[in-house]
């Protein structure tokens, strides 16, 4: 059975500002199996890595007087949001901005890089990954070692219905870019993910790359809400809902509380049936997000301890801000499992 995969959530976002080339590079060096870029669109149709299209909280745009008049309010996925939006900037303008740490009060060390890092495009991220792969291959040949596994990418389409309504549909652009860089087919070393359902179904008609239905702990996929479909994320994780997902996706990416909830004191409880229900219909399970800081941990456990509980529950991979700890926990768990089997 393949070992669980370690997905670097927004890169090594525990060690550097998220969605920067430095963050992705650190994650690769830490041994992540996949790096995860969240994708949004520029005015001129370029995919760039940001967790949301409003960039006031993760760049220096608020201090850039030349862009003061770009501040506006937009309705994004049914919610009024005020700030600066990627779709109001051409790529050359976004490239003048500099990334900032999202949660400086939790990760003050990351602020040392504030002001020094650009917003990367998907093309730049893929080039970084390919370059790292080539260096690994060369090093392995020099040392007479087996060729290493490729480094995977795990892009998420952010606000796909919203961008489609602006004439900036993401699906064909994403597939074309990935194929041009050699990512194609079921073994193409890429997963494509979304919190919406319709664009995943559209992607399933464009590519054989595996798709991942992301699942929030509550609420409704925006495209279902927009169409009048009354189903919620809770409906999607019923046996009937999972069977439908299995018709267009290979995996789900649930909020981790849907796999193992916490009690009122913050301690992990017994696992739910979600992993078993997914495996029964052929879906893999990649929960999110595992973070090492105390503010995010269950009571009584560090990150390795938390991951040990989730790995024991049968997950097939996980998103983490600290890929080095994730790799260490995964390797320790799989080594221990093999030793138990051989005894």
Predicted feature residues:
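Phosphate-group recognition and catalysis centered on beta-loop-alpha active-site segments
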Residues: 1-343
């Amino acid at each position: 059975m393949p070992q669980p995969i370690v997905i670097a959530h927004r890169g090594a976002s525990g060690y550097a500002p998220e969605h920067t080339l430095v963050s992705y590079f650190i994650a690769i060096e830490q041994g992540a199996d996949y790096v995860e870029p969240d994708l949004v669109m520029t005015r001129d149709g370029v995919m760039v890595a940001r967790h949301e299209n409003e960039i006031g909280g993760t760049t220096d745009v608020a201090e850039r007087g030349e862009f003061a008049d770009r501040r506006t309010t937009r309705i994004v996925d049914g919610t009024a949001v005020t700030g600066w939006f990627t779709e109001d900037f051409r790529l050359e303008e976004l490239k003048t901005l500099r990334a900032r740490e999202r949660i400086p009060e939790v990760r003050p060390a990351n602020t040392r890089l504030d002001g020094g890092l650009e917003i990367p495009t998907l093309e730049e991220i893929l080039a970084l990954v390919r370059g790292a792969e080539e260096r690994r291959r060369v090093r392995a040949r020099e040392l007479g070692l087996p060729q290493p596994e490729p480094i995977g990418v795990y892009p998420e389409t952010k606000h796909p219905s919203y961008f489609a309504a602006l004439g900036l549909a993401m699906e064909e652009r994403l597939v074309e870019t990935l194929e041009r860089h050699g990512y194609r087919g079921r073994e193409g070393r890429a997963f494509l993910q979304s919190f919406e359902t319709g664009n995943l179904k559209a992607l399933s008609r464009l590519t054989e790359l595996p798709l991942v239905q992301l699942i929030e702990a509550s609420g409704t996929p925006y495209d279902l809400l927009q169409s009048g479909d009354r189903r919620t994320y809770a409906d999607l994780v019923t046996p009937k809902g999972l069977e439908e997902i299995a018709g267009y996706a290979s995996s789900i990416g649930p909020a981790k509380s849907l796999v193992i909830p916490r009690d009122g004191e913050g301690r992990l409880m017994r696992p739910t049936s979600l992993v078993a229900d997914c495996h029964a219909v052929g879906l893999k399970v990649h929960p999110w997000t595992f973070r090492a800081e105390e503010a995010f941990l269950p009571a009584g456990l560090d990150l390795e301890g938390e991951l040990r509980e989730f790995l024991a529950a049968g997950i097939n991979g996980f998103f983490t801000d600290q890929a080095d700890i994730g790799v260490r926990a995964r390797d320790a768990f799989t080594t221990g499992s093999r030793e138990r089997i051989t005894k």
